[in-house]
Amino acid sequence: MSASTSTSTAASQDACYISLLGLAEYFRTSQPPNIKKCIQCLQALFTFMPPSKVEARTHLQMGQILMAYTKNIDLARQHLEKAWSISEPLPNFDVKFDTASLLAQLHLQTDKNSHQAKAMLRRAVELSQNNVYWHCKLLLQLAQIHASDREYSLASELLAVGAESADEASATYLKVLFLLSRAMILMIERKTNDVLALLNSAGQIIDNNIPNPHQKEYLKVFFLVLQVCYYLALGQVKTVKPSLKQLQMSIQTIMAPNWPSDEAIFGANQLEMFVWLPKEQLYVLVYLVTVSHSMMAGYMDKAQKYTEKALTQIEKLKQQEDKPILSVFKVILLEHIVMCRMVMGNRELAIREIAAARDVCMAAPQRTLLRRHSAQLHCLIGLYSMSTNLFEHAERQFVVCVSETSERDLKLFANLNLAIIYLRTKRDTDLKQILDAVSTENTHTYSSQALMGGFYYVQGLHAFHKNSFHEAKRFLRETLKMANAEDLNRLTSCSLVLLSHVFLSIGNSKESMNMVTPAMQLASKIPDIHVQLWGSAILKDLHRMSKDVQHEKDAYANHVKYSENLIADQRKCVQSAHHELVNWFQGDPPVTSGPPATPVLLMPESSVTSSVPVIASTSAAMQPAGQYGQFY
């Protein structure tokens, strides 16, 4: 065959490839897409015995189409594995990296564990060292899988490598993404000093070395979300306010109508084609951290308002594209709002929303969300059981929560509520054992102001029940000092009302009145029906002692009103189909039917509150996810 004939044949083949690829793309983008004909066009390419690179790329495209548009996962896997085997030995050929990334995703969807996905990505990371874009993208993907498997040290190491690679390539924007992603992992590990150092380093780079104002604003939002979560994890509700305000202003800037699209901001340079979250999801996330702050600060009405807005936004985004991260956001929001409902005495709504959270978890593929949130659901059901006086059920729920979780804050929160159950059921040996264990394990290792304040409160409650009033005052003053320093209003109101009861018990009516008055003012502002119930009983006794008949009648009327509200709500609870969830202790939660939760509300004893008076997020450490850096 002459050279001219050979060249002509090659040109003819190239024309066929281009025609078939063009036709395949035409069928794929038709309305509606004609995927069958698209696949037939790609399949026809193989009959021309194409060169290795064309063959590998076509197998990759077949795999992509099959994964995106069909349920034929096995055939998709075959094409991707063929693409990998052809492309792996070929130098300077990016198809191998795209294929490895997709194959890893497929393994995660179909395999029982992530071993094969990790092995595939490790090999691709090794091969991609001369291609900064793919090296960094694959490092992020591998780090995400390790983080999902709670292998945080490995995830952190990979992100550190990514930051170095980006730095060597002078990709400053990408370097900051790696630094902030690593800070997020270290936050989950509770390495607070390391988190602070990384945030400070990233913050300086954002301020001084990011020339593009739009990228700068995105990085600022990521940075501020982490900073807010950092302070909230420490229970520093007052300290966080300036950062939260700055975050809310930044997100308004990004959501403004004249703000460019994500594609326009990140599409020009390959090393800037990375975003943590698209702006619509960032918007939901800012609502979420605002809900968390409002709840911890004791502003239940605000928390409810922001939850409604966030859930509405989530539903809008789900209609456009149902991304898994939206379900994560929804579950965390529901977990927060459930606790708000219980503080306000709306337990029937709370159990409906627990059922809604269960439904979201059960709908996620391979029960991944249920595995991550099972302990939190047990904790919430424990709180619900406590509030409806089902102490045996509550105890079992908290024990399951403690056994299932590796989150130290959640474990402490559940244990403190167990201590209150043992106190109320007069199980002194169990109470002493759990308080000693909590004290030994947490006194020097816990840095959350809110939870440590809750620990001192429980000790004060214990001392009060032992009639050790001097000891009770000592613990409660410590609680008040911590609560007042950070505007933890619910902890303050609960401590004040208990301190008032202590003074009432020792006959100091003046000090008792000085404590119960601000307690009731705060409880009304929150609103906390349990503190209002307790405080109204104390006020009734104080007015009786001072022979103030009218005020005694008013206090008694308020006490009856709060009691009747709680008793009426209790009746609704026991009649609810979702009440059956109190009997879920293992495996998948039972399916219950009842009216759905809509984002909108018999504890007549007056001597103790229904649960630990610190609103601690029962969610795992805030682990928001992103397009190339999903950690949750």
Curated annotation (Swiss-Prot):
**Assembly and interactions?**
Interacts with Nipped-B to form the cohesin loading complex.
Can you say what this protein is called?
Answer: MAU2 chromatid cohesion factor homolog
Q: Which Gene3D superfamilies match?
A: Tetratricopeptide repeat domain (1.25.40.10)
Subcellular localization: Nucleus, Nucleoplasm
Cite a single GO BP annotation: maintenance of mitotic sister chromatid cohesion
| Residue windows of the TPR repeats | 453-486, 493-526
Tell me yes or no: is Repeat among this UniProt entry's keywords.
yes
Q: Give the primary localization class.
A: nucleus
**Might you report a single GO cellular component term?**
nucleoplasm
InterPro entries of this UniProt entry?
MAU2, TPR-like_helical_dom_sf
Query: What domain of life is recorded for the organism?
Result: Eukaryota
Q: What Pfam families does the database record attribute to this sequence? A: Cohesin_load
Q: What task does this protein carry out? A: Required for association of the cohesin complex with chromatin during interphase. Plays a role in sister chromatid cohesion and normal progression through prometaphase.
Give UniProt keywords alphabetically.
Cell cycle, Cell division, Chromosome partition, Mitosis, Nucleus, Repeat, TPR repeat
Give the family this protein belongs to, as stated in its UniProt record.
Belongs to the SCC4/mau-2 family.
Q: Does the keyword Signal apply?
A: no
